[in-house]
């Protein structure tokens, strides 16, 4: 599986995808950071990640839309399905590679934390809890994005399905408070308060695993009919 992770991770930088994702995220994050810190005099690093979660909603489809759809379009999926590697390892390899890109982006945000330390005394524990929540949110997004990519060979359609799903559950609580617990963004919003909500953490992990398993099932079925 390490070979798949290595191949997929490198592919993000052989193409502009990795650079575009990291670059756009940091540019947009910098804008929100500047507004919060220099306009509103806020030194709460964790609350800036509310904006980071919004940015992630728009950018994750860039990472995931070609994960499997590109393989189908170019015909290389046949090689994956007939290779000695199991479908499970292939899917997990793609998932982990995309997650590493987000993790690298998160590490880059420590620069902003250093700037806040110069202006004030941000809470390191709360910031770390926020980063954990952000990574859990990203993993949930990535797992669904890869699932969407597995059901179509068109990258654009995969991207539209992914972002459409995110926005549907983002705005769902606006119609009724009953749906609040179904919103991934709402679940993330508790982490910047410094609280690790076990129920939300379990939901993130369960959602991620479910999407990965569904992706494996989709690819296994496609393999069985070839």
What are these regions (language model features)?
Residues 60-64, 112, 143-144, 214-215:
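Hydrophobic/aromatic residues in alpha-helical transmembrane segments
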Residues 44-48, 63-81:
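Transmembrane helix boundary and interhelical loop/hinge segments in multi-pass membrane proteins
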Residues 94-95, 130, 162-163:
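Residue-level recognition of transmembrane alpha-helices
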Residues 1-18, 225:
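Aromatic- and glycine-rich beta-strand/loop motifs that create alpha-glucan
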Residues 37-42, 46, 164-226:
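Terminal transmembrane helical anchor/hairpin motif
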Residues 16-36, 51-60, 164-168, 210:
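Hydrophobic alpha-helical transmembrane segments of multi-pass membrane transport/permease proteins
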Residues 29-36, 44-51, 55, 97-156:
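Secretory targeting signals
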């Amino acid at each position: 599986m390490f070979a798949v992770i290595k191949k997929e991770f490198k592919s993000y930088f052989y193409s502009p995808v990795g650079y575009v994702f990291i670059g756009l995220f940091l540019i947009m994050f910098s804008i929100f950071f500047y507004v919060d810190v220099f306009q509103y005099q806020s030194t709460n690093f964790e609350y800036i990640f509310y904006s980071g979660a919004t940015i992630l909603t728009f950018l994750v489809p860039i990472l995931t839309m070609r994960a499997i759809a590109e393989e189908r379009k170019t015909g290389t999926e046949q090689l994956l399905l007939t290779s000695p590697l199991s479908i499970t390892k292939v899917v997990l390899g793609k998932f982990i590679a995309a997650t590493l890109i987000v993790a690298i982006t998160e590490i880059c945000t420590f620069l902003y934390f250093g700037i806040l330390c110069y202006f004030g005394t941000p809470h390191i524990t709360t910031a770390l809890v926020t980063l954990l929540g952000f990574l859990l949110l990203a993993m949930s997004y990535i797992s669904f994005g890869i699932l969407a990519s597995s059901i179509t060979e068109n990258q654009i359609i995969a991207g539209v399905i992914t972002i459409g799903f995110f926005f549907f559950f983002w705005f769902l609580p606006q119609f009724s408070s009953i749906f609040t617990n179904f919103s991934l963004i709402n679940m993330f919003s508790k982490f910047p308060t410094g609280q690790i909500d076990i129920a939300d953490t379990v939901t993130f992990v369960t959602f991620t695993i479910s999407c990965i398993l569904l992706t494996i099932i989709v690819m296994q079925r496609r393999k069985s009919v070839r």
